[in-house]
């Protein structure tokens, strides 16, 4: 059984938020996963859907696999780098803003 993978690095969403979406499509058929992502209201769903479409294209074009037989065999979200920003506050103080990123990896197979 061959697994085809695609990765989106430095996606502009936190890993915690993206994992909520990833848990919904793990071990589902590719068609069902696309339906779930299409009707989800989360920003991370759009990012995961782009990676899923990319890995489907890779499997079809590079390996000649049939899309109807494919399942999401692995999907995981790792934390990327965090950009640190400053928000000025009263009396010369500052609060830190953490702009988190994540790495989205989707693998499909039979």
Swiss-Prot record:
- Which terms does the UniProt entry file under GO BP? translation
Q: Does the keyword Ribonucleoprotein apply?
A: yes
Write down the superkingdom of origin.
Bacteria
Keyword terms: Ribonucleoprotein, Ribosomal protein, RNA-binding, rRNA-binding
Q: Where are the membrane-spanning stretches?
A: none
Q: Say yes or no: keyword tRNA processing present.
A: no
For this protein, the record's Gene3D superfamilies field holds:
Ribosomal protein L22/L17
A single Gene Ontology MF term assigned here is:
structural constituent of ribosome
What PROSITE patterns does the entry give? Answer: RIBOSOMAL_L22 (PS00464)
Q: Which residues form the signal peptide?
A: none
Query: What function is annotated for this protein?
Result: This protein binds specifically to 23S rRNA; its binding is stimulated by other ribosomal proteins, e.g. L4, L17, and L20. It is important during the early stages of 50S assembly. It makes multiple contacts with different domains of the 23S rRNA in the assembled 50S subunit and ribosome. The globular domain of the protein is located near the polypeptide exit tunnel on the outside of the subunit, while an extended beta-hairpin is found that lines the wall of the exit tunnel in the center of the 70S ribosome.
How this chain assembles, per its entry, is: Part of the 50S ribosomal subunit.
- Family recorded in the similarity comment: Belongs to the universal ribosomal protein uL22 family.
What is this protein's record name?
Answer: Large ribosomal subunit protein uL22
What gene name is listed for this protein? rplV
């Amino acid at each position: 059984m061959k697994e085809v993978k695609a990765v989106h690095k430095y996606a502009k969403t936190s890993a915690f938020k993206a994992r909520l979406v990833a848990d919904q499509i793990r071990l589902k058929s590719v068609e069902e996963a696309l339906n779930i992502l299409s009707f989800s209201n989360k920003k991370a769903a759009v990012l995961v859907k782009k990676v899923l479409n990319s890995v489907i294209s890779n499997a079809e074009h590079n390996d000649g696999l049939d899309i109807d037989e494919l399942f999401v065999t692995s999907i995981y979200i790792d934390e990327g780098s965090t950009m640190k920003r400053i928000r000025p506050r009263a009396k010369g103080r500052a609060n830190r803003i953490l702009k988190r990123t994540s790495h989205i990896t989707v693998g499909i197979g039979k």
